[in-house]
């Protein structure tokens, strides 16, 4: 930071916003090609471009923060605000799904048989796999908090252990959810019940996969001694995101699985 007299990070010109925008265009065009022409070539190209962009952009962020020291307290404050706003936007995203669910379930139309779940739908038992999923995510919330406290206290081994447990629980949750989808007696095309169930729980599952990936990156960074007790925003952001995923699941469980059944 010797070459500047302020605490802010003046970012160097980067190609990643451009390649990110290109990947978004390729993915959306690819989805249309897949839906209408059953061709996945453009979609795969878009997904590959997106993955490469994310990998290289975040690699640059890690270089700037860990090795070049650009992430001063002022910069970290801005990143914190950014992460908080991102999580708020995700809350509003899920609010739309809950709105759709309650709009359909609180006043079922005659087409649904005037009842909820609609006539002919056999909902999943909330006291079986969904309850196990709930306990798995709650346990992962405890282990990520243990990891955070261990990091604050400078206990590297405990932090790695707790982080590994959290990742394992996240993967276990994803596998349970996949098996539940496979065995579900209804599909996404079974009216508004199937739509709201699979879209809401499916997007939550996607967020669990994203959160698990975020934590895996943090795990490998910690193996390379990237985090200290007073400089670890990358891990902190991952922990906040994981707690958000946790809370959304509790609302999904109570609304869709328990009350909705």
From Swiss-Prot:
The chain crosses the membrane at residues 16-34, 41-66, 73-105, 129-152, 156-183, 191-223, 233-256. GO terms for cellular component: mitochondrial inner membrane; respiratory chain complex IV. It holds the Pfam family COX3. Signal peptide: none annotated. Its main location: mitochondrion. Residues 35-40, 106-128, 184-190, 257-261 are mitochondrial intermembrane. It is a multi-pass membrane protein. SUPFAM superfamilies: Cytochrome c oxidase subunit III-like. InterPro entries: Cyt_c/ubiquinol_Oxase_su3, Cyt_c_oxase_su3_dom, Cyt_c_oxidase-like_su3, Cyt_c_oxidase_su3-like_sf, Cyt_c_oxidase_su3_a-hlx. Its EC number is 7.1.1.9. Gene3D superfamilies: 1.10.287.70, Cytochrome c oxidase, subunit III, four-helix bundle. It catalyses: 4 Fe(II)-[cytochrome c] + O2 + 8 H(+)(in) = 4 Fe(III)-[cytochrome c] + 2 H2O + 4 H(+)(out). Residues 1-15, 67-72, 153-155, 224-232 are mitochondrial matrix. GO terms for biological process: mitochondrial electron transport, cytochrome c to oxygen; respiratory chain complex IV assembly. It is an enzyme of class 7 (translocase). The keyword DNA-binding does not apply. It is found in: Mitochondrion inner membrane. One of its GO terms (molecular function) is cytochrome-c oxidase activity. It comes from the Eukaryota. Keywords: Membrane, Mitochondrion, Mitochondrion inner membrane, Translocase, Transmembrane, Transmembrane helix. Belongs to the cytochrome c oxidase subunit 3 family. Component of the cytochrome c oxidase, the last enzyme in the mitochondrial electron transport chain which drives oxidative phosphorylation. The respiratory chain contains 3 multisubunit complexes succinate dehydrogenase (complex II, CII), ubiquinol-cytochrome c oxidoreductase (cytochrome b-c1 complex, complex III, CIII) and cytochrome c oxidase (complex IV, CIV), that cooperate to transfer electrons derived from NADH and succinate to molecular oxygen, creating an electrochemical gradient over the inner membrane that drives transmembrane transport and the ATP synthase. Component of the cytochrome c oxidase (complex IV, CIV), a multisubunit enzyme composed of 14 subunits. The complex is composed of a catalytic core of 3 subunits MT-CO1, MT-CO2 and MT-CO3, encoded in the mitochondrial DNA, and 11 supernumerary subunits COX4I, COX5A, COX5B, COX6A, COX6B, COX6C, COX7A, COX7B, COX7C, COX8 and NDUFA4, which are encoded in the nuclear genome. PANTHER family: CYTOCHROME C OXIDASE SUBUNIT 3, CYTOCHROME C OXIDASE SUBUNIT III. This is Cytochrome c oxidase subunit 3. It comes from Antilope cervicapra. The gene is MT-CO3.
